[in-house]
């Protein structure tokens, strides 16, 4: 970066809570633990709502208010330690605090179980009576209904409590182990003639020099293979624990729970993947044209993020990326632009490219502070800028919901990914409209269509892999070698066998942290869902040509906290997600972008 940087690349955590190394934070955590234990004990005697008498409703209202306050504090603590641990992956103190907070999981399970078991006995009529008979409960009527639905994923009370206690040193411990292993991993690469060790997040595959991409790629494969056995244990035991519980619950299959968590019907998931499989062949035109522009017969895995040849092949500074995002969001709506500037200026974002950070990116919320924090590693590419816009989109979603009751600020991951990918769409379309020449427009379209490949092919390969892995895991542990075979098989199917024969990534099951998130299963299809939903919404905005669309979009974001996925879209935009129409509308946008890219790529202007 040339000259003095305008925007800080490091976040401000000190204004949120006391630093973890001090006594004040220790005291804060101890008080939280005590209050959590007391409320968990109180929850054991929470009455059933099978007979919603006025005194019972009042007791529930008071309990839910206490739970609201305690949940805010606990969420802030989790997010705070998570931020510190991500920014300093090898810090043992932060790892210890992560483990300590995880150990409180059984108390939280007691609380959520008490709510769900208490609601389980209530009929629809009783639940409606309950919400109309108490104003405070009426405000969170949808959340109560959703909690009653989630009670189907609960074992009998004593078994549920035992499972929660065992998960601390089982399910969630395997997730934490993966975080430590991947955080400590170093990839040995060549930089400017020197051999250096880099964190996974620092090793990029977007160099204009193919030899650099190939060397980085093969170095990454070698490094990840060195931890294959440990990661194989982790992924097997995470999946195995879940499958054991699913069997005890009598669930249809391993997709039942993810669908519950995403407030989504199986017909919707099937309609989405069916549309993707029927239409994604159009992406072969993009992959072929990009290979031609790069002088290759076929793209390999290391070429998917490669930049196109351009007379202006320089990167984009963090300051420039921030200004572009602010300007693009502001043209959509002043509130969106003002919010983006707020996150950047007030240092809600950590982007510094340095050793010792965890890989990946995230946005995490602090409901007690009504703020968010964003984590990523910015490496000066268009893809980095898109990731930044993506995470700011997440933060804006939380910002819109911040005045709602806490339990109506919770939204499923598929709808969370809609707001973030919509932000990327806003940035991309604004930049494309302002593109000055063929090379610039090709570069913008390349970024957009690389995202399409990620969401419609890469994420699909993850879904196919996890689906088949879970089916095989029912019969016992799956070896690392077999996991690699399943990964390549899934990639070939999802990418329509379009990459070079030696271009498949058999270590992707090891390097992709989404497979190891112990708190949520099948953390893959929400991305494709959110991507296509955001494109469809953007198409509605483009076609409507109405100045009131930003307000409709805001109402859509508010609805994500108090409706099912299908009702959120139906009430906001009038589409039935169980039918192919909306998904095809989204895929029409992708097809149009491919046509524009292929035409520009074949032009000599």
What are these regions (language model features)?
Residues 1-311, 599-604:
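A well-structured
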Residues 314-316, 349-371:
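Catalytic zinc-binding patch centered on the HExxH motif and its immediate surroundings
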Residues 293-331, 337, 341, 363, ...:
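Long, K/E/R/D-enriched contiguous segments that form extended
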Residues 313-316, 369-389:
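Short pre-active-site segment immediately N-terminal to the catalytic Zn-binding motif
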Residues 412-440, 448-450, 454, 530:
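Post-HExxH zinc-binding segment in Zn-dependent metallohydrolases
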Residues 4-7, 14, 20, 115-119, ...:
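C-terminal, non-catalytic "cap/extension" segments appended to globular domains
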Residues 250, 379-399, 420, 425, ...:
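Active-site recognition of the HExxH zinc-binding catalytic motif
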Residues 373-377, 403-413, 442-451, 470, ...:
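Short beta-alpha connecting loops at secondary-structure transitions
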């Amino acid at each position: 970066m040339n000259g003095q940087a305008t925007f800080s690349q490091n976040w401000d955590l000190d204004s949120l809570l006391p630093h973890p190394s001090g006594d004040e934070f220790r005291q804060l955590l101890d008080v939280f633990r005590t209050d959590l234990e007391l409320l968990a004990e109180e929850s054991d005697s929470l009455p059933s709502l099978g007979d919603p008498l006025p005194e019972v409703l009042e007791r529930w209202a008071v309990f839910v208010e206490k739970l609201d306050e305690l949940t805010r504090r606990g969420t802030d603590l989790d997010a705070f330690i998570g931020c510190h641990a991500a920014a300093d992956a090898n810090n043992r103190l932060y790892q210890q605090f992560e483990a300590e907070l995880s150990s409180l999981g059984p108390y939280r399970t007691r609380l959520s179980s008490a709510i769900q078991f208490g609601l389980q006995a209530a009929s629809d009529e009783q639940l409606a009576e309950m919400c109309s008979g108490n104003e405070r409960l009426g405000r969170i009527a949808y959340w109560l209904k959703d909690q009653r639905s989630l009670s189907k994923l609960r074992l009998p009370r004593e078994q549920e409590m035992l499972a929660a206690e065992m998960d601390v040193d089982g399910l969630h411990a395997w997730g934490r182990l993966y975080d430590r292993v991947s955080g400590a991993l170093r990839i040995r690469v060549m930089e400017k003639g020197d051999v250096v060790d880099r964190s996974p997040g620092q090793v990029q595959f977007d160099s204009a020099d193919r030899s650099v991409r190939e060397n980085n790629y093969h170095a990454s494969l070698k490094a990840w293979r060195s931890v294959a056995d440990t990661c194989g244990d982790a992924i097997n035991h995470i999946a195995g624990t879940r499958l054991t519980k699913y069997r005890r619950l009598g669930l249809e299959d391993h997709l039942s729970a993810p669908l519950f968590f995403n407030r989504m019907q199986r017909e919707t998931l099937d309609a989405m993947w069916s549309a993707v499989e029927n239409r994604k062949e159009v992406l072969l035109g993009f992959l072929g044209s990009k290979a031609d522009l790069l002088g290759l017969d076929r793209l390999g895995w290391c070429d998917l993020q490669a930049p196109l040849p351009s007379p202006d092949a320089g990167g984009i500074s963090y300051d420039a990326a921030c200004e572009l995002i602010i300007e693009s969001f502001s043209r959509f709506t002043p509130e969106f632009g003002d919010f983006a500037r707020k996150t950047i200026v007030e240092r809600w974002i950590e982007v510094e490219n340095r050793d010792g950070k965890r890989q990946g990116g995230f946005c995490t919320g602090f409901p007690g502070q009504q703020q968010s924090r964003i984590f990523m590693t910015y490496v000066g590419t268009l893809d980095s800028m898109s990731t930044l816009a993506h995470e700011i989109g997440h933060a804006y979603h939380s910002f819109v919901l911040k005045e709602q009751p806490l339990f109506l600020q919770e939204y499923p991951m598929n709808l969370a990914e809609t707001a973030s990918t919509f932000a990327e769409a806003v940035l991309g379309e604004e930049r494309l409209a302002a593109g000055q020449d063929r090379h610039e427009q090709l570069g913008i379209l390349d970024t957009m269509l690389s995202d399409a490949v990620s969401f419609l092919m890469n994420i699909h390969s993850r879904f196919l892999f996890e689906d088949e892995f879970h089916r095989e895991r029912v019969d016992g542990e799956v070896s690392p070698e077999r996991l690699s075979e399943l990964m390549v098989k899934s990639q070939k199917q999802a990418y329509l066998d379009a990459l070079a024969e030696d271009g498949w990534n058999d270590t992707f099951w090891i390097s992709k942290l989404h497979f190891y998130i112990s708190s949520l299963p099948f953390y893959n299809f929400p991305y494709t869902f959110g991507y296509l939903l955001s494109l469809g919404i953007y198409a509605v905005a483009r076609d409507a040509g109405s100045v009131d669309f930003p307000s409709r979009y805001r109402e859509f974001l508010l609805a994500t906290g108090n409706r099912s996925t299908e009702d959120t879209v139906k009430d906001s935009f009038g589409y039935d997600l169980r039918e192919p129409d909306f998904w095809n509308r989204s895929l029409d946008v992708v097809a149009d972008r491919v046509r524009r890219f292929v035409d520009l790529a074949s032009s000599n202007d």
